[in-house]
UniProtKB/Swiss-Prot annotation:
This is tRNA-2-methylthio-N(6)-dimethylallyladenosine synthase. It comes from Karelsulcia muelleri (strain GWSS) (Sulcia muelleri). Its main location: cytoplasm. It catalyses: N(6)-dimethylallyladenosine(37) in tRNA + (sulfur carrier)-SH + AH2 + 2 S-adenosyl-L-methionine = 2-methylsulfanyl-N(6)-dimethylallyladenosine(37) in tRNA + (sulfur carrier)-H + 5'-deoxyadenosine + L-methionine + A + S-adenosyl-L-homocysteine + 2 H(+). It is an enzyme of class 2 (transferase). Catalyzes the methylthiolation of N6-(dimethylallyl)adenosine (i(6)A), leading to the formation of 2-methylthio-N6-(dimethylallyl)adenosine (ms(2)i(6)A) at position 37 in tRNAs that read codons beginning with uridine.
């Protein structure tokens, strides 16, 4: 029997990249062969993102393109994985696809694929699991990479009114910490230089033996048996002292002093925190069901700067949320002016089916107003990024070389501890080397320097 080939196309966040690596491992172990060529695949899997309307439209367009490429070949399976799976539960209404699998059901993919080719059984699985973290699966990663994603938890309990994640990925469940440590050590032996610990809300990580976090009862277990994020972060730092460690994403409501002190203590933990604020308006934060106020957020920012003075800060900002007015928008700009983030991810709000905002709030800010406000936010962030980057000029930064610059093949690019991109002449080094670079120039997006010997 000829072994079937599968092709995976990935959209969305770093978690989706990690999930695609898990799916590749599951399929490889069942005898399927991965290909990077869509046209030679029997199985085409699209790992989807539904965080914004624009993402979904892009994916649906891509599926139509794939259908055109394969024509009417009924022997090719097209499957949807990830966050859009919940939208395709009634597969009979969607002639574009043959298979639908949600984030907690990836172990079932081989059987579902076999069902399709045998023309029997089910081609869909979107149920949530109370325990699934794929802790026993070593992801099938691309060769010659130096950075690896390590998922430490799945799902989210925060129920922000704008966010679809609890409905697409389920509730919070944390992975066995000892499987995380084992994977990190494995990656070090394989030659990886950096790991990124992933979760929808890493600071909410809590291991007490497994299961949903919302089922946890503090009185039923000894405190020393509990491993929270600060303890996990320290365990990882100690276990792989020669690897760089990053993590994302954090929620301001859950970040503790203990986490900050661990970041400060260990040199191999990068001095960068991604701390989404979403809005600088308390009124909008309340409508979003964020558990922090603007004042809480500023106190946390001040604490970070006090404990880790050179810590780089980034955030997510949503503009044009339901009922947002000019005063709310200006308060967001004011917060940005106070923090002066190194960089930010900035988006226009779009209604997500299934969320509280979709059901109960009106998306009443015009698109033109959203676009204008987003432009103002982006322009201000560019000013702040340039301001932050200027401060690096004259300094010597420890850089991990990540690749060749896309703008000049004679230059490498890499990142410092603060996650800032740095470009510099190649010389006699290679991708994966740690080097020192003296910064002599910058733009709002990039630091420019020379190798310092």
């Amino acid at each position: 029997m000829i072994k079937k080939k599968f092709y995976i196309e990935n959209y969305g966040c770093q978690m989706n990249i990690s999930d695609s690596e898990i799916v590749s491992s599951i399929l490889n172990n069942k005898g399927f062969i991965k290909t990077e060529n869509l046209k030679e695949a029997n199985i085409i899997l699209i790992n989807t993102c539904s965080i914004r309307d624009k993402s979904e439209k892009k994916i649906l367009l891509r599926i139509n393109q794939i259908k055109f490429i394969i024509k009417k070949n009924n022997d090719i399976l097209i499957g949807i994985l990830g966050c859009m799976a919940y939208k395709f539960k009634n597969i009979k209404e969607k002639k574009l696809i043959n298979l639908v699998v949600g984030p907690d059901s990836y172990r079932e993919i081989p059987n579902l694929i076999n069902n399709f080719f045998k023309k029997k059984g089910e081609y869909i699985s979107t149920s949530f699991s109370k325990t699934e973290t794929y802790a026993d699966i070593i992801p099938k990663r691309e060769e010659k990479k130096i950075t690896a994603f390590v998922t430490i938890m799945r799902g989210c309990d925060n129920m922000c009114t704008f966010c679809v994640v609890p409905f697409t990925r389920g509730r919070e469940k944390s992975r066995d910490p000892y499987s995380i440590i084992k994977e990190c050590k494995f990656l070090f032996k394989k030659g990886y230089k950096e790991i990124i610990l992933l979760g929808q809300n890493v600071d909410s990580y809590l291991w007490y033996g497994g299961g949903l976090k919302k089922k946890f009862k503090i009185k039923e277990i000894k405190n020393e048996e509990i491993i929270n994020f600060s303890k996990l972060l320290e365990l990882v730092a100690i276990s792989v002292p020669l690897m760089r460690i990053r993590f994302c994403t954090s929620n301001p409501n859950d970040m503790s002093d203990n986490v900050l002190n661990v970041i400060k203590k260990y040199i191999n933990i990068c001095k960068h925190i991604h701390l989404p604020v979403q809005s600088g308006s308390n009124r909008i934060l309340s409508l979003m069901n964020r558990k922090h106020t603007c004042e809480d957020y500023i106190l946390l920012i001040n604490k970070i700067k006090n404990i880790i003075p050179n810590c780089s800060l980034s955030c997510d900002i949503i503009t044009g949320f339901c009922n947002e007015n000019e005063n709310d928008h200006n308060e967001t700009l004011n917060l940005m002016n106070y923090v002066k983030y190194n960089f930010s991810y900035m988006f226009i709000y779009s209604h997500r089916i299934g969320t509280y905002a979709y059901k109960k709030l009106i998306d009443n800010v015009s698109l033109s107003t959203k676009k204008r406000r987003l432009t103002e936010i982006i322009n201000l962030q560019k000013t702040h990024s340039y301001y932050r980057n200027r401060k690096y000029i004259g300094s010597i930064q420890d850089i991990l070389i990540e690749g060749i610059s896309t703008k000049n093949i004679n230059f490498f690019y890499g990142r410092n501890s603060g996650n800032d991109i740095v470009i510099f002449p190649k010389k006699n080094y290679k991708i994966g080397d740690f080097i020192k670079v003296k910064i002599n120039n910058c733009t709002s997006a990039t630091l420019v320097g020379d190798i310092y010997v």
